[in-house]
């Protein structure tokens, strides 16, 4: 009888342990990390060339409207210009994305706070296209094109055409 009572008590304790919800909170302090990165400026410039090619190609320079039945054509788009301050901001984001793959910075600040930190002040629109796991600049560009996606899946495409 005593042994049955012990088993019953253990089962009750386990049930209580499993049934009581726990609040799990993320660590509020940050931990500095040191990383070594190799930047692909050549690939970045190749992608810029591909984007500029697409911006002037009437077969590509469109996106679906929210109704997913009609297209908005982007006419007379000017080529994007390479900007060294923006390159520095992009390199900073690349290092941060190596730590945490997200559209937020590792310290949870908004992505675009990196602009001010790198003297990027002249812009009319901002967007961020990030990629991981691609072998080539061409495959990244193709992934961002989102040719067969509806409006909701063409955010990268609209970034490149804005």
Segments from the language model and where they lie:
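Short, flexible loop/turn elements at secondary-structure junctions
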Residues: 3, 84, 132-134
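Bacterial N-terminal signal peptides that target proteins for export
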Residues: 1-10
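A broad, structure-centric signal for solvent-exposed, well-ordered loop/edge residues
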Residues: 8, 87-89, 137-139
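A well-ordered secondary-structure block
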Residues: 96, 110-162
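Bacterial N-terminal signal peptides
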Residues: 10-19
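Alpha-helical and His/Cys-centered functional microenvironments
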Residues: 11, 107, 160
């Amino acid at each position: 009888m005593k042994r049955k009572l012990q088993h019953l008590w253990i089962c009750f304790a386990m049930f209580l342990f499993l049934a009581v919800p726990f609040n799990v909170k993320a660590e509020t302090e940050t931990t500095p990390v040191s990383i070594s990165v190799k930047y692909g400026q050549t690939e970045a410039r190749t992608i810029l060339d591909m984007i500029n090619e697409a911006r002037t190609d009437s077969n590509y320079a469109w996106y679906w409207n929210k109704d997913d039945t009609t297209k908005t054509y982007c006419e007379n788009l000017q080529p994007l210009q390479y900007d060294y301050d923006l390159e520095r901001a992009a390199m900073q984001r690349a290092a941060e994305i190596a730590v945490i793959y997200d559209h937020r910075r590792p310290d949870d600040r908004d992505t675009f706070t990196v602009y001010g930190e790198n003297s990027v002040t002249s812009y009319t629109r901002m967007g961020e296209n990030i990629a991981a796991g691609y072998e080539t600049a061409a495959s990244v560009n193709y992934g961002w094109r989102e040719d067969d996606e509806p409006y909701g899946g063409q955010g990268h495409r609209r970034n490149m055409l804005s």
